[in-house]
Amino acid sequence: MAVSRSPVRRATSGWSTVTAALAVVVLVSGCGGETGGADGGTDPGSPPTGDPATGPGGGRNLTCGRSSFPPDATFYQDISGAALDPESHAIMAALDARNWGDPGDRQTLGIDFSFAVNCATTSVALRSYTQDGDNQPDCDLAPVPLPLGGKTEGSNDYACSGGDCHLLVYQATRLYELYQANVAGGLPTGGAFTGTCLAIWDLTRDYWGPTNHSPNYSRGDACDGGTAADLPIAPMLLTAEEVAAAVAGDGIIHHALRFTMTNNRLRSTGYVHPATHFAFGGTTGGADTLPTGARLRLRGDYNLAGLPSDAARVVARTLQHYGMYLVDGGNIYLSATTDAAAALNNAAVGALRPRDFEMVGGGRRIGQRDYECERTPVTN
């Protein structure tokens, strides 16, 4: 659903080209587990009893057998008591008056179950890709692991037939996120490997801490990436494993979620940290709309009893404690892995309206032309 491309580009003379063979490995797609339990047995407004699993931020964000990013990463911070953004009341009132979307667009908060997280062992060799478009120096140019049996967003393999086709791969201490990835014909006999923009994330690095400042904040202010906000996708996805663990445990997934927004409800210029880029090309929202990078929190007084399942209440309780980041334009959806559809459905949180949310105070506001992306792309 991305509409992101940087408004400022600097051309380069060519791309990095590295060739390597692919190795056969076991793929864990979605890194999923058991699904959530049935309704009943607990007070739907209170977290179920039980010990939470350990993990970053006191939670359970363990993907491909390891944690993603240091525990003080922005999406692991509990913001249930955080101050509101000064614009919160005006923006949320304006959004509520118009609803999540216009007639003809989606008008209720849904869940997009099209994402897949691919787990590559260190024995998987890397394969070079050819970049489509002129997205430099924003995008990384290093080769990418492609485990056999893997797939991109919205596909059953690595062949992209249209859409965003995000490729998400964990390998060792790196997370590779490639926008519009395509292996012609898929693997193992596929042809050319292409993609529009690659963001490589170092899982040991704190990109958003207090010592990080513009223009070198995160991967660089004004720098595009795998999604408009240039925030990592995989750590903020809903997964079946997390939902099941939360239903059986403390009732909360201990990280922020990500969501996309109808284009005319998304501010057309500027962004707020931790985002480092804004949705561009199709977004038309004015000053009373949400900026890219906004973090919304479900109101603490929202009555969870009316939600349809324990799994839906897990999502809502997570939104009360960790919120959801606005990462791109397109339509009004939370993002989830395909396996999470066994525990939830598209309408699980459809009762949540704009009036039920608040905009939490974020980081620095960045204007459309405050910076030009300045970074050295990763090439190996």
Segments and roles (model prediction):
Residues 1, 6-9, 28-58:
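Ser/Thr-rich, Pro/Gly/Ala-heavy low-complexity intrinsically disordered linkers and tails
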Residues 6-18:
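N-terminal export and membrane-targeting signals
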Residues 17-29:
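Bacterial N-terminal signal peptides
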Residues 50, 55-380:
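Short, surface-exposed polybasic-aromatic patches that bind anionic ligands, especially phosphate groups
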